[in-house]
Amino acid sequence: MMLLLSCLFTPIIWESSDSTFRNERLAPVKILFVNKFLYSRGGAETYFLKIGEELTRRGHEVEYFGMYDEKNTVGNALHLATTNMDFHNAGPEKLLYPFRILYSFEAKRKLKQVIGQFQPDLIHFNNINFQLTPSVICAGAECGVPMVQTVHDVQMLCPNHMMMEFNSKKLCEACMGKKSKWPCVKKRCIHGSLPKSLIGAVEGTLYECNHVYDKIDRFICPSAFLEKKLLTVPRFRGKTVMLHNFLSRVAAAAPAEKGDYVLYFGRLSEEKGIDRILEACKLLPDIPFVIAGSGPMEDLCKNCTLPNVKYVGFQTGKALEDLVAGALFTLHLSIWYENCPLALLESQSLGTPVLCNRIGGIPELVEEGRTGILNDTFTPAAYAEKIRALYADKPLLAEMSAHCIQKKDRMMTLERYCDQLLALYGDVVKNA
């Protein structure tokens, strides 16, 4: 191991459900990030790419391993990546996908080559299923490298990653903690497809039975909710750390001048409740709404003919910041177990209150009545009632906007997050 631990301590401490770690100032370390996508695509990619940038800035050595794509922005010295698997536009090669998504010998072989050349002190896994498969965990274990994994969703507990039935959209925990994932097949939980659900169930059952996740030294949970779910399964007990996600942009110093609109920004998908949001918009013809984002239900938003709804497409950077900062409040009405949604944090950091469903890890991020309002009934009519009341109460909105700005100093920053992450790395390596 090239990791050198000094005796200089900093006062950063955090607690998980099982133990307390103290941050130790570290000499330069070698970290290998593993994720199926190596370009900015979603929350998981933003997470590890930002961390990688910050660790590099601090003088640590960072390399990456994942799937080949022309859009990749990071990689490793050997320029190794697995063959691209495009489930939506694949040709005849997709006939081999059912075998490759269960166990990728290619990913395992190439990762071992990268490990051999880079000699990392620690491997940090993120999203690996399907395109890389947990075979990469076996590669790390066989090379004797300490490993941590950030748990971005409930995939380790549920084959469809959402704990929500595909057809009924009801929350479901039928597979949680069980070796057999047969309920996934019975309910056709993956895209409503029997073959896909069967493959997902086989994958989940395979990795439950061969205990591959036992090889991970520590699991980072972005919400107390997700940590609690993991701890219902004995193999995760004593291995979890809860760290809320960080803000990657600078928080606002004061509330911006507000426009006259309510905003939804983020992924346009059913689990995010975008269809129900549009139904609520229909019930509120006098309230202007703006929708920004992309995703599976993008056409529904593009083709929306409601005069009070404006779809502005995918936004990023300064344009998105201005849009969020200028909104009266933002909507976060997911119907699935959200983990630690960055959009919710970003809205509050820019001085914009939030209206959220009380589900998953969302309540942990909202000071009810101060930075946002929580909703308990997930119907368009209930949404409309909450939106109407909040839209009409401009003094409350102004007060909550001020509280959001005050809260920014208590939010997790990238710098603070990396301090705590390095402490965790040091603890894992010392005890490996």
Where are these regions (language model features)?
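Membrane-proximal helix-turn-helix segments that form the acceptor-binding/catalytic region
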Residues: E142, Q155, K170-R218
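Conserved donor-binding/catalytic core segment of Leloir-type glycosyltransferases
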Residues: I220, L247, A254-K272, L278-L284, ...
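Carbohydrate-associated surface elements
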Residues: F225, F246
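Nucleotide-activated donor-binding/catalytic signature segment of Leloir-type glycosyltransferases, i.e.
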Residues: D299-D322
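Acidic donor-binding loop of glycosyltransferase active sites
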Residues: A325-N339, T352
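Short acidic/histidine- and often glycine-rich active-site loop of Leloir-type glycosyltransferases
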Residues: L344, I359-G369, I373-N375
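Conserved acidic donor-binding segment of nucleotide-sugar-dependent glycosyltransferases
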Residues: E368-G369, I373-P380, A389-K394
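A short, well-ordered alpha-helix in the C-terminal region of glycosyltransferases
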Residues: A382, A389, L396-M411, Y417-A423
